Amino acid sequence: MERLILKKLLNWKNSPYRKPLILKGVRQVGKTWILKEFGKRYYDNTAYFNFDENEEYKQFFETTKDVDRILQNLMLASGQKITPEKTLIIFDEVQDCPKVINSMKYFCENAPQYHIACAGSLLGIALAKPSSFPVGKVNFMQIDPMTFTEFLLANGDENLANYLETVNTIEPIPDAFFNPLYEKLKMYYVTGGMPESVKMWTEARDVDAMQEALSAIIGAYERDFAKHPNISEFPKISMIWKSIPSQLARENKKFIYKVVKEGARAREYEDALQWLVDARLVHKIYRSTAPGLPVAAYDDLSAFKIYLVDVGLLRRLAQLAPTAFGEGNRLFTEFKGALTENFVLQTLITQFEVTPRYWTQTNPPYEVDFLIQRENDIFPVEVKSEANTASRSLKKFKELFPDQVKLRVRFSLDNLKLDDDVLNIPLFMADQTDRLIGLAMEKRLR
């Protein structure tokens, strides 16, 4: 499989400011495979150390802070060779090894000639603890589920992926590309972007195996809930997790605690919800009161929406059968377009530094699905799971904030086009949002 993060890893390798790397990502998103593949492509050899399978490795970090001695002990214990600049050193499953994480300070300061990458499940939880990592002494990188573009590459559709990457004008996509891209996107909604699920489809075309892969991943996540230090939070985390399809099936997708459990209150469940956020199993999107900068200054902390880390996992958790793939556009519109909204949010999270927000108004009701910050501009985004749809909320938003709105963005089943200041992006081009906004802004300035 070709993962686009390999380019970022190569930039890290070649950077004169390189520090030990901590690669974050949910369980089974492909962290270990990526690092091993990176080592195979760009280094003479890879030295791999798994602290879950070989707990004795932890002792080497507990008895000394001397990096040369640590590496000597690791080489003697494992029989692996480590050469400065030539070897990629991978420390895997480090989430329960604070001494290993803290040792990155000494590798950074005293042994920058060694290229070290750390990975582990639930690292977001570990790093949220006080004094759990050396500030300023490590580089962070996030790996998310495979994008639609990566899915196309894995599926052997390099021509379609390459076409999307080379679109450089805001003009309608020819039917020769438009139609097959929508069919492929339907399948991506089914598989999602978890590598094992994608593999079961792209290599074996085995729907049952794909379903089992997604179920196994969900099961692994649910077993992780028990790792919360306060065991009483375990059932609360589980209830929140299982409520997400119901939350997103509502017309108003604002997270409601009573959907989790009748009579539930925020103060009883907010720690459990934060655990899911820190684990990056869910994305928490706050309501914004206005399109101002910095966006965090306008957050309504009492109102937010919750999305799953992956659209395929959401489909499986919601128990939507893969057969919906063949039923016209049903997969796009199923349960209030939740799959489509989750898919778009996934792509925006990976493209923009600032987490998206959303905006609502009551009496009469209007909702802009997302607000995205690109440089110093904020763009309202509406997600439609059908074609030929009106954008009354985008219109209202511009009426209220005319000076702040340079461009409005709509995702739908319609073709690529720019109508005045409304940029319509076909759903299958969501990975190209940042670039397309740039092209649209240039076109409007001409």
Residue ranges of predicted features:
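Interdomain hinge/linker elements that couple catalytic modules in large macromolecular machines
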Residues: 153-346, 356-363
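Short glycine-rich substrate-engagement loop in P-loop NTPases that contacts/grips substrate
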Residues: 53-84
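Short regulatory helix/loop adjacent to the ATP-binding pocket of P-loop NTPases
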Residues: 124-140, 152-157
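Conserved lysine of the Walker
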Residues: 31
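Conserved P-loop NTPase "ATPase switch" module shared by AAA+ and STAND
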Residues: 82-99
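A cross-kingdom feature that marks ATP-driven nucleic-acid transaction machinery
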Residues: 13-21, 28, 37-41, 271-446
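Pre-Walker A adenine-sensing motif
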Residues: 2-16
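Structural recognition of the conserved hydrophobic beta-strand(s) that form the central parallel beta-sheet
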Residues: 90, 115-121, 142
